[in-house]
């Protein structure tokens, strides 16, 4: 805990960002490439070991091509798959690229944005994972953010001065939410981000698709401060209990802190 307090916490989105099947980022990537059949199949079908009950029944029916049975099986709370299937059934053409495109266009904008941002979040986490040994450092050409919650990044030019501010917890390097309006760093940071794009089959010029208008890109902090930390021993009897409380900047996940604490 002392190390996290001193260095800050790696600002991973973590598993909860990608759904219980861990594939919302794959949906987002398919949507951004306008591979709508693939996106619809990921949302409505491709039954796997994690699927149970009515959701498994619905996905199995979809995979078998029975769109009506799939629609009937989805729980009412699963609005996205139901909306897609209603559109496909109404069109009456089965699953084709054309019918999938119409179905995707029927999705609620919030659902669409959720999938697109999941794709961006996955790549952000991959950049942070590559930089994890140096996540609290500043590199020449970095786009840095003031802590705890600034959104406007600035280019690191005076490395000595900015590294001192980073060591004091005043600023942090930023990472990418890739998109056409995302400011790009220079030097070593830029090369790392381009390598992550390439590893996922993307190039910088692929980030101009029409659907990026829903998630145009931004910079986020690679680390976040652990504020107002309080640890209390609440052990009673033979049961060891520790109460942990802390504050994080808006938009950051407490699960990221817990994941770091539980590392061996």
Each language-model region and where it sits:
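Extended, charged/glycine-rich binding lobes that contact polyanionic ligands
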Residues: 1-237, 241-245, 249, 259-264
């Amino acid at each position: 805990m002392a190390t996290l307090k001193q260095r800050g916490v790696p600002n991973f989105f973590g598993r909860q960002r990608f759904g219980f099947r861990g594939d919302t980022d794959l949906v987002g990537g398919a949507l951004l490439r306008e591979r709508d059949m693939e996106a619809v199949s990921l949302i409505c079908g491709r039954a796997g070991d994690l699927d149970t009950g009515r959701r498994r029944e619905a996905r199995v029916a979809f995979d078998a091509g029975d769109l009506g049975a799939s629609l009937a099986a989805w729980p009412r709370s699963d609005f996205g798959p139901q909306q897609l299937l209603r559109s496909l059934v109404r069109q009456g053409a089965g699953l084709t690229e054309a019918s999938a495109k119409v179905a995707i266009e029927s999705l609620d904008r919030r659902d669409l944005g959720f999938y697109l941002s999941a794709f961006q979040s996955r790549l952000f986490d991959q950049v942070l994972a590559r930089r994890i040994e140096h996540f609290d450092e500043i590199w020449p050409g970095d786009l840095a953010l003031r802590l705890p919650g600034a959104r406007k990044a600035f280019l690191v030019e005076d490395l000595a001065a900015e590294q001192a501010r980073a060591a004091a917890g005043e600023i942090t390097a930023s990472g990418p939410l890739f998109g056409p309006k995302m400011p790009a760093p220079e030097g070593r940071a830029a090369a790392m981000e381009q390598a992550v794009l390439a590893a996922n089959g993307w190039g910088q010029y692929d980030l101009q698709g029409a659907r990026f208008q829903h998630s145009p890109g931004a910079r986020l902090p690679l680390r976040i401060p652990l504020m107002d930390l309080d640890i209390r021993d609440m052990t009673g009897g033979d049961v060891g209990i520790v109460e942990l409380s802390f504050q994080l900047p808006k938009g950051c996940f407490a699960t990221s802190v817990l994941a770091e604490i539980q590392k061996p």
